[in-house]
C-alpha cells in the first residue's frame, strides 16, 4: 500500500473536513501518498484527482462542508461506471480508497471492493442512521444546530402563545428529532420508527392548555410527513394557533462541534490503519467509545434502530 485515495459522497455533514484531514495526515505519517478525489464517485469516474499534502488540509478542521465537494452519480451505479472508476484509480496508481459518506456511498464502496479494489468506509451523515456505529460524523453538530434553533423559536412561541411544529431532517431515521426533542423538552416527538395516534397528541396539547400552558413545541422528522399538513390538522382539531418552521439545510452546515471533530479524526485515522493492514470492504465506527469495524455486508444486514429507552423517556417527560 503506497497510495491512498479519499472522497466524500452523498449529503455533506459537518466534520467531513476533519475526517479528510485525519486521513491525509495519518497516511503521510506512514509515508504514504494521498490523492483527493473531488465531487465523489462522479469525480472519480471523470479523473478529477489530485495529490494532497499537509498544506492541503491546513486550517480545515473547524470548517463545515467538504473541501473535496460531494455529488451523487447514477452512472456510478452501473458496472460500466464502476469499471471506469477503477480504471482511473489504476491510472493514478492508487492502491486503496477511503469513502466518507452514508449508506449509499458504502454501497458504491462495496461494489468497488467486490471488483478487487479495497475500500474503507467512514460514516459521515447527520441522520445517524448507519448500523455498526453509535454515532456518525455530523450528527452532534446538526443536533446542536436544531437545539439552538428551537430554543429561539420557543421564545417567540411563548410571546405569542402558539404551538410550533418544527420539521427536521430524517427521512427514514428519527434520531435528530428524538434527541433534539428530548433536549428541548418538546411536548411531542414524531419519528418514522414509532407511530403515534393523532388523538393522543391533540389530547396532550389540550391537557397542557387546560392547566395554563400557553405554548407547545412539536418536533417532527420529515419522514413522518409534511409539517405544514400536520400543523393544519392540529389547528383544526385542537383549535390552537399553530405555526410551522422547516429548518432545512441549515442542519447540514456550520462549524463541527468538538465531539464531531474528535470522532472524525479517530475514524479517519483508523481507516488508514485498516488499509495499511491490507483490509478492504469494511466500515469503521465507534461503539461505547471504542473503535470498531465491520464488513459492509454486516452493516447493511442490520437495521438501524432508535434508542427505545430514550423514546420511552421522552414520552414520560412530556406529560
Swiss-Prot record:
Residues given in the record as ADP binding sites: 21-25, 154, 185-187, 211, 213-215
Quaternary structure annotation from Swiss-Prot or TrEMBL: Homotetramer.
Active site: 127
UniProt xrefs under InterPro entries: ATP_PFK, ATP_PFK_prok-type, PFKA_ATP_prok, Phosphofructokinase_CS, Phosphofructokinase_dom, PKF_sf
Statement: the UniProt record of this protein carries the keyword ATP-binding: yes
Organism the protein comes from: Oceanobacillus iheyensis (strain DSM 14371 / CIP 107618 / JCM 11309 / KCTC 3954 / HTE831)
A Gene Ontology BP annotation from the UniProt entry: fructose 1,6-bisphosphate metabolic process
PANTHER family, per database record: ATP-DEPENDENT 6-PHOSPHOFRUCTOKINASE, PHOSPHOFRUCTOKINASE
Family to which this protein belongs: Belongs to the phosphofructokinase type A (PFKA) family. ATP-dependent PFK group I subfamily. Prokaryotic clade 'B1' sub-subfamily.
Cofactors that this protein relies on: Mg(2+)
GO cellular component annotations of the record: 6-phosphofructokinase complex
Residues annotated as binding ATP: 11, 72-73, 102-105
Stored Pfam families: PFK
The protein's role, per its UniProt record: Catalyzes the phosphorylation of D-fructose 6-phosphate to fructose 1,6-bisphosphate by ATP, the first committing step of glycolysis.
UniProt keyword list: Allosteric enzyme, ATP-binding, Cytoplasm, Glycolysis, Kinase, Magnesium, Metal-binding, Nucleotide-binding, Transferase
Sequence positions that bind Mg(2+): 103
Activity control, per UniProt: Allosterically activated by ADP and other diphosphonucleosides, and allosterically inhibited by phosphoenolpyruvate.
Pathway info: Carbohydrate degradation; glycolysis; D-glyceraldehyde 3-phosphate and glycerone phosphate from D-glucose: step 3/4
Annotated binding of substrate, by residue: 125-127, 162, 169-171, 222, 243, 249-252
Name of the protein in question: ATP-dependent 6-phosphofructokinase
EC number: 2.7.1.11
Group of enzyme by EC: transferase
Catalysed reaction, written as an equation: beta-D-fructose 6-phosphate + ATP = beta-D-fructose 1,6-bisphosphate + ADP + H(+)
Cross-referenced HAMAP family: Phosphofructokinase_I_B1
Amino acid at each position: 500500500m503506497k497510495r491512498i485515495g479519499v472522497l466524500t459522497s452523498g449529503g455533506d455533514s459537518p466534520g467531513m473536513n476533519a475526517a479528510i484531514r485525519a486521513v491525509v495526515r495519518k497516511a503521510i505519517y506512514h509515508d504514504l501518498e494521498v490523492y483527493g478525489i473531488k465531487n465523489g464517485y462522479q469525480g472519480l469516474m471523470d479523473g478529477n484527482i489530485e495529490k494532497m499534502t499537509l498544506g492541503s488540509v491546513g486550517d480545515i478542521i473547524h470548517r463545515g462542508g467538504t473541501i473535496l465537494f460531494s455529488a451523487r452519480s447514477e452512472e456510478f451505479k452501473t458496472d460500466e461506471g464502476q469499471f471506469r472508476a477503477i480504471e482511473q484509480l489504476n491510472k493514478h496508481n492508487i492502491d486503496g480508497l477511503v469513502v466518507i459518506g452514508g449508506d449509499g456511498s458504502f454501497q458504491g464502496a462495496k461494489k468497488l471492493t467486490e471488483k478487487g479494489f479495497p475500500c474503507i468506509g467512514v460514516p459521515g451523515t447527520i441522520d445517524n442512521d448507519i448500523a455498526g456505529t453509535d454515532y456518525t460524523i455530523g450528527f452532534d453538530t446538526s443536533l446542536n444546530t436544531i437545539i439552538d434553533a428551537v430554543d429561539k423559536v420557543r421564545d417567540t412561541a411563548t410571546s405569542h402563545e402558539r404551538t410550533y411544529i418544527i420539521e427536521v431532517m430524517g427521512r427514514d431515521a428519527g434520531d435528530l428529532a428524538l434527541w433534539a426533542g428530548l433536549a428541548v423538552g418538546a411536548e411531542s416527538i414524531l419519528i418514522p420508527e414509532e407511530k403515534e395516534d393523532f388523538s393522543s397528541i391533540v389530547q396532550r396539547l389540550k391537557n397542557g392548555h387546560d392547566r395554563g400552558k400557553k405554548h407547545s413545541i412539536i418536533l417532527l422528522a420529515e419522514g413522518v410527513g409534511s409539517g405544514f399538513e400536520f400543523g393544519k390538522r392540529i389547528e383544526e382539531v385542537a383549535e390552537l394557533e399553530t405555526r410551522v418552521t422547516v429548518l432545512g439545510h441549515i442542519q447540514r452546515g456550520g462549524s463541527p462541534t468538538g465531539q464531531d471533530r474528535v470522532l472524525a479524526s479517530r475514524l479517519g485515522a483508523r481507516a488508514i490503519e485498516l488499509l495499511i493492514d491490507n483490509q478492504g470492504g469494511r466500515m469503521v465506527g465507534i461503539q461505547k467509545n471504542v473503535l470498531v469495524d465491520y464488513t459492509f455486508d454486516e452493516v447493511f444486514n442490520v437495521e438501524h434502530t432508535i434508542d427505545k429507552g430514550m423514546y420511552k423517556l421522552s414520552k414520560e417527560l412530556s406529560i
